[in-house]
Structures are given as C-alpha cells and as structure tokens.
C-alpha cells in the first residue's frame, strides 16, 4: 500500500472530476483502478487484498467520495472507454475490453454518463 501511495504524484491527470477517498486503503484501490481501469478484480477480491469487509469498503467509499464504489469504478471505465473510442477503437471491442457482457449494456451506460451514444461520439 505504501508503494502505491508513493506513486500518487506520478499519476497522469484525470480529465474529469473524480472524488478521491482519504483512507489509505481506498486510495491504494483507486490508484490501482486509475492505472488499470479494466481490471477484472471483483470487490470481494479487493476487500481480501485490503483486509476489510465488503460492507466496510462500501460504507467508507460512500462516506468519503459521495458515491458507491461500483458507480465510481463504472465512471473510470467509461472515461477510459471514451478515450479508446476517440482513438478509433470499435464500440464492440471497447465494450468487451471494459468488461461489459453485452454491447447494448455498454451503450446504455455510456449514454447515461455522457448524454450520447458511443456511435454519436465517433461522428
């Protein structure tokens, strides 16, 4: 965890507002996800790694960021997806890379966050 905290100043700037927690364990989690947004690790795996229960993680994350861990993680993934789409990747490839089970679920989540579909972004 201390190694991850040392890496914070080296992180690239995030081009969107993103609430960050203060708890060192949650900072380590968020840092790892910022570096690898499409990480397949589940919340249970993160909790085991961080030595906390799922309920504790959920409660702390909500209190310190104002949103749920799942919502925060989805925002990271969708912003990463947007960058991939802007680089010319196909909607299908990006949806699968971001861990969505279906392209339609990805499109719905993308539209909810950005107000337009991935296809509209490409135009």
What do the PLM-derived regions correspond to, one by one?
Residues 24-32, 73, 77-80:
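Pre-recognition alpha-helix immediately N-terminal to the DNA-recognition helix
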Residues 13-25, 59, 66-74:
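Short, Lys/Arg-enriched anionic-surface-contact patches
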Residues 48, 59, 63, 96-97, ...:
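Alpha-helical residues within the helix-turn-helix
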Residues 109, 113-123:
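Short, basic/aromatic-enriched C-terminal tail that caps enzymatic domains
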Residues 40, 44, 63-103, 107, ...:
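Terminal helix-turn-helix DNA-binding modules in bacterial transcription factors
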Residues 1-19, 49:
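Linker/hinge segments immediately adjacent to helix-turn-helix/homeobox DNA-binding domains
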Residues 49-56, 99-105:
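Short, basic interhelical loop/turn and adjoining N-cap
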Residues 7-14, 29-42, 61, 65, ...:
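Basic, amphipathic alpha-helical hairpins
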């Amino acid at each position: 965890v201390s190694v991850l905290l040392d890496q914070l100043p080296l992180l690239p700037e995030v081009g969107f507002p993103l609430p960050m927690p203060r708890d060192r364990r949650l900072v380590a989690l968020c840092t790892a996800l910022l570096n690898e947004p499409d990480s397949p690790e589940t919340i249970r795996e993160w909790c085991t790694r961080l030595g906390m229960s799922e309920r504790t993680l959920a409660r702390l994350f909500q209190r310190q960021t104002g949103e749920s861990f799942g919502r925060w993680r989805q925002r990271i993934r969708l912003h990463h997806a947007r960058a991939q789409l802007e680089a010319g990747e196909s909607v299908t490839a990006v949806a699968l890379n971001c861990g969505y089970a279906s392209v339609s679920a990805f499109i719905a989540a993308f539209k909810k966050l950005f107000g337009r579909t991935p296809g509209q972004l490409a135009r």
